[in-house]
Amino acid sequence: TAFAKCRIRGPKAEEFLDYLVANKLPKKIGRINLCHALNTKGGVHSEFTIMKEAENSYYLVSAGANLRLDHDWIQKWMPTDGSVIFEDLTNSTGVLVVAGPKARELMQKVSTDDFSNENFKWLTAKNVNVGYAPVNAMRVNFVGELGWELHHPIEYQNHIFDKLMDCLLYTSDAADDPTC
């Protein structure tokens, strides 16, 4: 869960983020874009993965090492009229990454949801279940392989990890484990 995570919401959330970052914001709910925040000299301040989670609500992910820098910087530029609300989700939201040539096969074992390429395109996010845990699966990762970031309430972290590890052993030609 080594990411900084926050939600920006409110009637002017889109307008605010459009001002704050370079690159286009995702327009459709469930879409993701990689956006860069620029400093006053036009250099890159930080990089954010931004997902539109609802109308007037965006979920932002950045490097965990930049938590204070990024969150303080966002709040510095927020309008003071209450039209934009910042919510730090770093401690309440966990993230596990599943990536590699058998990532889809593993995800199909731990979830009843459809992880096919046709149903789950690059730079999209969907609410799914892993075991009994609610997960926002984001089809994005930066390791050069097929994969998903699994964003979830932190109280489900151990369950999701255990489910992935239990089923990981059964992604080859071995017999399926009935617990997966």
What are these regions (language model features)?
Residues T1-S172:
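Basic, glycine/lysine-rich polyanion-binding surfaces/domains
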Residues Y170-C180:
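Single conserved hydrophobic/aromatic residue that forms the stacking wall/gate
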